[in-house]
A protein has these predicted regions:
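Domain-level signal for soluble alpha/beta catalytic cores
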Residues: 1-378
Length: 378
């Protein structure tokens, strides 16, 4: 198992030139080849940033993604028409003077309309590109399969899939094939992003899934079973599992501690590293960490990606010591609380803010553990 005391969730701010190029490519103002070259350069810059601050885990910054989950929708047919709001709907809360609350409605026509057919792998090409450009450990993030329950509709999807369960079974198969191919070509660290579980703390979100025929409790239990099916049994591969409460334009969807889901998620999910959000009071206490079994690490997301304010190292060290009351220090790590840009709409920080926060991750790990990186095999 990979054992790093410094980690990060994955996404980084998109350069303005990349955002403009994406719009230009969509409008056919530039060629796809030109857009690909701009994407490649953005990924290379993201890699250099992570290496510069000393991170042992390197991602492509998700520079090629519209959203952290969009690679799936881009790689299969059958989902019908969708846009960015398919991944963003909900009531978003803001706490900055310049970032207020906003509500994004669920697109009325959203829904799988045909049997899913994979047209390409989601992230295999991205991994090959990334691995060729760094000597550090490359990490690829994939969406949790049950996150796609959002795309099944009782009104428009029954002709393709009579039940939500049958739809998600095909999602699991596609993601399981993706993981198997990534492992075959050499991936050793794969992360599943699962923000929807913590969102079950929110009454509106619970109500939506119950309207689809699944209670929140069943959704959580079956969701973890699906996650475990995707991760499978791959010796030598470390799986991360990221839980947050929504991260978009410096806003969030839900508040509350992990108490209601800790026993099910922390104990039953097959992942070896739990990347948890703990950047402010709305994240709750460390008490739920008592449910973490001895074969798992906890990556404490203590450094916020939502605000430019830079935490002090003393503050971070104190919080790590507090968490060590529930999980031994040697099985803890530190990271930012979430990505810096879970979609092309990044958080309200500058690239300089982002770099300072990533550097603080590494420096804090060095202070607490004497090193930011360590690789071990158990």
């Amino acid at each position: 198992m990979i054992a790093y005391h410094a980690d990060h969730v994955g996404s980084l701010l998109r350069p303005s030139g990349l955002i403009t190029a994406r719009e230009d490519a969509a409008a056919s103002r530039i060629s796809q080849a030109r857009f690909k070259a701009i994407e490649d350069r953005a990924v290379e810059d993201a890699i250099r940033l992570q290496e510069r601050v000393g991170l042992p885990v390197i991602t492509d910054g998700e520079q090629r993604r519209l959203s952290f989950q969009s690679r799936f929708a881009e790689s299969v047919s059958g989902l019908g028409d969708w846009d960015l709001n398919a991944f963003l709907w909900g009531h978003w809360h803001g706490d900055l003077s310049t970032v207020g609350d906003v509500t994004i409605e669920r697109p009325a026509g959203l829904g799988v309309v045909e049997k899913l057919q994979r047209s390409r792998y989601l992230s295999v090409e991205d991994f090959v590109f990334l691995r060729a450009r760094t000597t550090c450990t490359p990490k690829i993030a994939l969406p949790s399969p049950s996150l796609w329950a959002n795309f099944w509709s009782a009104q428009s999807s029954r002709a393709a899939y009579s039940t939500l369960e049958s739809f998600l079974a095909d999602v699991v198969d596609i993601l399981r094939e993706e993981v198997a191919e990534l492992v075959r070509i050499g991936a050793t660290y794969i992360q599943l992003d699962a923000p929807h579980y913590a969102l079950l703390l929110d009454p509106a979100t619970r109500s939506f899934y119950e309207s689809q025929g699944w209670s929140a409790e069943r959704y959580l239990e079956r969701g973890i079973e699906m996650d475990n099916a995707v991760m499978g049994d791959f010796p030598g591969v470390t799986f991360g599992f990221h839980l947050c409460r929504g991260n978009q334009g410096s806003r969030w969807l839900a508040s509350g501690g992990y108490e209601r889901i800790a026993r099910t998620v922390f104990r039953r999910v097959r992942a070896q590293r739990l990347l948890l959000e703990y950047d402010d009071a709305r994240s709750g206490s460390f008490e739920p960490l008592k449910e973490v079994p001895e074969d798992k690490w906890v990556v404490l997301g203590l450094i916020t990606t939502k605000r430019p304010h830079l935490e002090t190292m003393d503050e971070l060290v104190s919080r790590i010591r507090e968490a060590s009351r529930f999980v031994p220090l040697e099985r803890l790590a530190i990271s930012p609380q979430c990505g810096f840009s879970s979609s092309v709409i990044g958080n309200a920080l500058t690239p300089a803010d982002q770099e300072r926060k990533l550097r603080l991750v590494v420096e804090t790990a060095q202070r607490v553990w004497g090193e930011a990186t360590r690789t071990a095999t158990n």
